[in-house]
Amino acid sequence: MSPRRSVCWFVLGQLLCSCAVALQGGMLFPKETPSRELKVLDGLWSFRADYSNNRLQGFEKQWYRQPLRESGPTLDMPVPSSFNDITQEAELRNFIGWVWYEREAVLPQRWTQDTDRRVVLRINSAHYYAVVWVNGIHVVEHEGGHLPFEADITKLVQSGPLTTFRVTIAINNTLTPYTLPPGTIVYKTDPSMYPKGYFVQDISFDFFNYAGLHRSVVLYTTPTTYIDDITVTTDVDRDVGLVNYWISVQGSDHFQLEVRLLDEDGKIVARGTGNEGQLKVPRAHLWWPYLMHEHPAYLYSLEVTMTTPESVSDFYTLPVGIRTVAVTKSKFLINGKPFYFQGVNKHEDSDIRGRGFDWPLLIKDFNLLRWLGANSFRTSHYPYSEEVLQLCDRYGIVVIDECPGVGIVLPQSFGNVSLRHHLEVMDELVRRDKNHPAVVMWSVANEPVSSLKPAGYYFKTLIAHTKALDPTRPVTFVSNTRYDADMGAPYVDVICVNSYLSWYHDYGHLEVIQLQLTSQFENWYKMYQKPIIQSEYGADAVSGLHEDPPRMFSEEYQTALLENYHLILDEKRKEYVIGELIWNFADFMTNQSPLRVTGNKKGIFTRQRNPKMAAFILRERYWRIANETRGYGSVPRTQCMGSRPFTF
């Protein structure tokens, strides 16, 4: 690497190393209440990529000091969305480095003049590094592409007459061995093959590294003394539901808290006062997963009211599901009853939008999950939007909540620098998602090279840290390492195993699946005596490609492979296998390679959500299992999801 190039990337690294200074404290989902206002900044933003050789021109020329359009040509960029697929420019689709977003807005006069009001800027997802300015003044930086961060901008907007409000966000999608997910920048130095300075981003995960503002950017207000955080855990004592709460208030030490728990009909069923306490709910309605109860996903509302001697008030309402989770040697229990994960793995991925949040797509996906008879999914391989988890709470879809620890394959990615960042990511993930009843387990990684010696200490530390953050949920990671070589498996509560028998090896030989899968399960259980989830399995199928006898990439081969897996899963779920998650719910985009024809085709639905033959095979299976394991009458093919209109 040339000295100049080394200096450029060193400067970039210095900028990025500071990206963990976002607002500390709670991370309650922003919503309108009697004391809080919300302004959503979705829509068209000004956008430009920094194509300079060192990618630092925007910082060197301080693009944030004036409107972005004055720095040079800009594009209209929709937010939320990935920037990659919006234009016809291949250079932008594959761009690595800094891109710049900007949006101007008008604030209500009361926000800028009411000194009893606090104004907060929240970015729900900026992939991967982000630096944020308001009216040219630096307000926050953040590392990590899938979790929200905030900045209190009250002083900026209330410091004097405000004629304009301009938000500038610089985002860098460069991945290093120490990021989550990791990656490397590889320079191609052969002058006979590559132009000077040519580089590519190398990644060890099989999905496209979409980038941009993937979720909403919002402004919201609170009183200057405000409810900062709420933590809820639940338990059951016979037929009495127990709701334990802890509330954090910022801005003053002088306040009173009143807590009310309301049922779905709006009736108050319990009251409390103070920062912490326990609410007892006689004859409680429990939160049950979809297809496990005739009235699944029952949600109470926890209403918190804070008042101060100065007559300042703050209100916040949190949906609460009363349920318990436990793990034995061979069972996963929800409310004391065995639960079988009959579900899918997903991606936040769609045409044009990339990883951008999209309500129509989200509702379509949930309707397909219910049609399928699926009761669960894993957020492979990163945290999904909060709106996804809110719908899971409402619909009774159980979630294995996974952090972006995918592609951890290099020895340096198991060092102290990576571990420190990984611990911070789990802090952020648990802080955001701790109150969702649908979240029943944390996953700290997917397919790490956990046979490496440092992996033992790494996962022991990481899992212990996650358990300390949340003692109420089991912790796992998803492995594709041999059972007798996995250094992290001793520390998980549930074994999650990925295997692609007759796909990535023994190509086309469906006849070996049953023997190999039986051996897989028996070896893992014999060594660890823990329940097992088949966390990934599947085969690529090009929609409309048919071959009989089945051949690879045909829909027939995909269904035949699934059916061979199902024969053994049916045997082992009577013993210690507690779930199966197909890979994947829908086709999704990947990097270009000879092994991928416009992405990964292992979906049982196409990227446009049209079913392949495998979707009908899986639907028949999941509804059969639901009827076999039901604890009440015949399972209806459609279930009502609550009687009250639902708002987030």
Curated annotation (Swiss-Prot):
Post-translational modifications: Undergoes a post-transcriptional proteolytic cleavage near its C-terminal end, which reduces its size by approximately 3 kDa. The site of this cleavage has as yet not been determined.
GO CC entries: extracellular space; lysosomal lumen; lysosome
Entry GO MF terms: beta-glucuronidase activity; carbohydrate binding; hydrolase activity; protein domain specific binding; signaling receptor binding
Catalytic activity: a beta-D-glucuronoside + H2O = D-glucuronate + an alcohol
Signal peptide start-end: 1-22
Glycosylation site list: N172, N416, N627
Alphabetized Gene3D superfamilies for the sequence: Galactose-binding domain-like, Glycosidases, Immunoglobulins
Natural source organism: Rattus norvegicus
BP GO annotations: carbohydrate metabolic process; chondroitin sulfate proteoglycan catabolic process; heparan sulfate proteoglycan catabolic process; hyaluronan catabolic process
Pfam families (alphabetical): Glyco_hydro_2, Glyco_hydro_2_C, Glyco_hydro_2_N
Protein name: Beta-glucuronidase
List of catalytic residues: E447 (proton donor)
EC numbers, comma separated: 3.2.1.31
Stated family: Belongs to the glycosyl hydrolase 2 family.
UniProt keyword list: Glycoprotein, Glycosidase, Hydrolase, Lysosome, Signal
Keyword Glycoprotein on entry: yes
UniProt keyword Cell inner membrane present: no
UniProt function note: Plays an important role in the degradation of dermatan and keratan sulfates.
Top-level taxon: Eukaryota
Subunit-structure text: Homotetramer.
Subcellular location: Lysosome
